[in-house]
């Protein structure tokens, strides 16, 4: 196999100008997906065992990220992101 059990991959994802980290860990019969905030705190995580689970998990994680943005940012944060897109 390409990935060994226990291998962890990380990727920066950007949602509405805010950076988050996606951490994916291979387990014996599943893959663990965890989204972390800019300080490394877990926002949400799920276990995925097949491709159908993946699409559901991505929707759930995306909703968790939007909730985090709503609860942890203010209008000035959002305005700064709009300015930085320029």
Residue ranges and their predicted role:
Residues 2-3, 38-86:
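Mixed-charge, Lys/Arg-enriched low-complexity segments
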Residues 4-36:
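Amphipathic, interaction-prone secondary-structure segments
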